[in-house]
Swiss-Prot record:
An example Gene Ontology CC term for this record: cytoplasm
Gene: IL13
Alphabetized InterPro entries for the sequence: 4_helix_cytokine-like_core, IL-13, IL-4/IL-13, IL-4/IL-13_CS
Glycosylated residues, chain numbering: 38, 48, 56, 71
Subcellular location: Secreted
One of the Pfam families matching this protein, by short name: IL13
Classification via PROSITE patterns: INTERLEUKIN_4_13
Family, as annotated: Belongs to the IL-4/IL-13 family.
Name of the protein described by the UniProt record: Interleukin-13
Species this protein is from: Canis lupus familiaris (Dog)
Top-level lineage group: Eukaryota
Gene3D superfamilies named among the record's database cross-references: 1.20.1250.10
GO molecular function, one term: interleukin-13 receptor binding
Free-text function comment from the UniProt entry: Cytokine that plays important roles in allergic inflammation and immune response to parasite infection. Synergizes with IL2 in regulating interferon-gamma synthesis. Stimulates B-cell proliferation, and activation of eosinophils, basophils, and mast cells. Plays an important role in controlling IL33 activity by modulating the production of transmembrane and soluble forms of interleukin-1 receptor-like 1/IL1RL1.
Gene Ontology biological process terms, A to Z: immune response; inflammatory response; interleukin-13-mediated signaling pathway; macrophage activation; negative regulation of complement-dependent cytotoxicity; negative regulation of endothelial cell apoptotic process; negative regulation of inflammatory response; positive regulation of cold-induced thermogenesis
Amino acid sequence: MALWLTVVIALTCLGGLASPSPVTPSPTLKELIEELVNITQNQASLCNGSMVWSVNLTAGMYCAALESLINVSDCSAIQRTQRMLKALCSQKPAAGQISSERSRDTKIEVIQLVKNLLTYVRGVYRHGNFR
């Protein structure tokens, strides 16, 4: 009986170790959200109204956003965001390559892209779809 009880306790403990644990949010993703909030709070015209190509944030959002923002020059406000996106982007776009995530016919202001990215990343963070 004692042996049987020991086996049951051991299996219970091992079962607890094998059970799936909750997915913890990426600290980088949380930092990105905080940075995007900081950028959008007091910026009526971010980067002097620079325009960037609109991107499809549902397909490779970090790389697509980075690729769109990488061509913005003389805008220190988004440099930290660019570094964070580089860390989150698993693929490096080739020079001169036109991404499938980018819509070449639509340009939007940098502030609008940042707001769109913030909305999308908040949703990803909220629903736990970490990539």
